Structures are given as C-alpha cells and as structure tokens.
C-alpha cells in the first residue's frame, strides 16, 4: 500500500462534502471511522461520530432540505504514512433544515460563512481513508 499524499487527502475532503450536499447518506457516513470523534459547531465536548452522523441526517438530509457547501483551499499535513490532518475554511448554506437551537427554538436554515474545519484522516487496512476526528467551529465576529 502506498503512503498518503496531500492530493489524496484533499480529494477525500471534497468528496465528503459533495456526498453530504448530495444527500448520499451511506457513502457520506462511510467516511467516518467507527472510533471517530467529532466536535461540531455547538459541541461542548467531543461526541462519537455515529451520533453526530445520525443527528446531521435528521437535521440536514431530509428530502426537503437544500444544502450547498463550498470548500476553500485545503492545507494538508502528512503526519505519517497512513495519517494526515486537513485544515480548511468552508461555507455551508442549508435551508429547510429540521433543527432546534441551543435556546430551544426551531431553526429552518443555517449559514456558516467561514467555518474552520479540521479533519484527521487515517488509511485503513482495506486502503480507504476514514475520518478519525473532526472539528468544526464557526467564526464569531
């Protein structure tokens, strides 16, 4: 098996968000390792990816929801032959979502203009790339 490359990791990042926006749920969730942890924009602690995936599916991936994602330049640091960190800025626009705010109010849209995202990817024994950690934070100005 060959070592990871920056372009391979960048392609994986872009693919994750393409699948999310296209609501290709099975393919999108397969990018997350079983052991993955996630810090979302509203997280107070890391959560297992399987829970975050289910929540995102319920909130963002219904038939009526419209999602657009734009990923800026992806900076990749290779930290071993099978592991890399990807850091980037993205924009997310979601309409007709089913989400409850921290204040308990229903939200129907979300717009993240300059969300900061970090992914840690690891190559598995079958050669695929999996996210083992994700952190998304929204810039507050």
Please provide the spans of the model-predicted regions.
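A solvent-exposed, acidic/Ser-Thr-rich amphipathic alpha-helical stretch
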Residues: 4-7, 25-82
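Short helix-adjacent coil turns
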Residues: 16, 20-27
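Hydrophobic/aromatic beta-strand elements that line small-molecule binding cavities or substrate pockets
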Residues: 57, 71-76, 90-92, 116-122, ...
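A short hydrophobic beta-strand element
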Residues: 81-98
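Intrinsically disordered, low-complexity Ser/Thr- and acidic-rich flexible linkers and loops
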Residues: 95-108
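Short beta-strand edge/turn micro-motifs at domain boundaries
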Residues: 105-141
């Amino acid at each position: 098996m060959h070592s990871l490359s920056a372009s391979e990791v960048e392609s994986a990042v872009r693919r994750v968000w393409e699948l999310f926006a296209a609501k290709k749920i099975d393919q999108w969730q397969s990018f997350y390792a079983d052991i993955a942890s996630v810090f979302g924009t509203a997280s107070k602690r890391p959560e297992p990816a399987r829970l975050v995936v289910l929540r995102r599916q319920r909130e963002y991936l219904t038939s009526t929801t419209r999602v657009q994602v734009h990923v800026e330049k992806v900076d990749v640091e290779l930290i071993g032959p099978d592991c890399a960190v990807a850091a980037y800025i993205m924009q997310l626009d979601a309409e007709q979502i089913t989400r409850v705010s921290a204040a308990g109010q229903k939200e129907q849209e979300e717009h993240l203009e300059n969300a900061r995202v970090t992914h840690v990817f690891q190559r598995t024994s079958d050669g695929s790339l999996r996210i083992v950690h994700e952190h998304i934070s929204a810039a507050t100005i």
